[in-house]
């Protein structure tokens, strides 16, 4: 019994029975540097700019409860490829919009409990190394709704 989720991971249909929700592990993607059409200004719509994407995901720990095969785990490889696919679809006006798309794709996997996402534009101001935002999202265990908290960073 296997089902497919859109992040490209194969998930056993009985996985929920095997997950210990009190235990988690982290998946980290640090400073994924990609070129993107992002921004509201004309020059940002005409030329790609470098962005940095960093993610920290708290995932239900199923490490000891199931067979150690990649298809049984949240795959950072699939997440990276899905982020690249989002950027290939075309121009995005705001980092906040890109952030929500990345959050949504990560939460498609029911094992992901929290997401901390940092998005930075690396070439906006010569006086800074970057400007950007951080987004934190947490699934509420009672009804699987997502609590939202958005903050900006320099």
Predicted regions and their residues:
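N-terminal, polar/charged subdomain of small-to-medium soluble alpha/beta proteins
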Residues: 1-154
């Amino acid at each position: 019994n296997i089902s497919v989720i859109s992040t490209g991971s194969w998930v056993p249909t009985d996985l929920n029975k095997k997950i210990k929700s009190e235990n988690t592990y982290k998946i980290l993607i640090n400073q994924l540097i990609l070129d993107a059409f992002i921004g509201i200004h004309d020059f940002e719509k005409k030329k790609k700019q470098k962005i940095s994407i960093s993610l920290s995901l708290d995932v239900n720990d199923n490490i000891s409860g199931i067979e150690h095969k990649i298809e049984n785990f949240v795959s950072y490889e699939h997440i990276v490829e899905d982020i690249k696919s989002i950027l290939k679809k075309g121009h995005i006006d705001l980092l906040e919009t890109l952030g929500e798309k990345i959050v949504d794709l990560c939460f498609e996997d029911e094992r992901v409990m929290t997401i901390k996402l940092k998005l930075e534009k690396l070439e906006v101001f010569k006086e800074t190394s970057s400007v950007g935002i951080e987004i934190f999202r947490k699934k509420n265990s009672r009804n699987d709704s997502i609590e939202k908290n958005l903050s900006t960073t320099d």
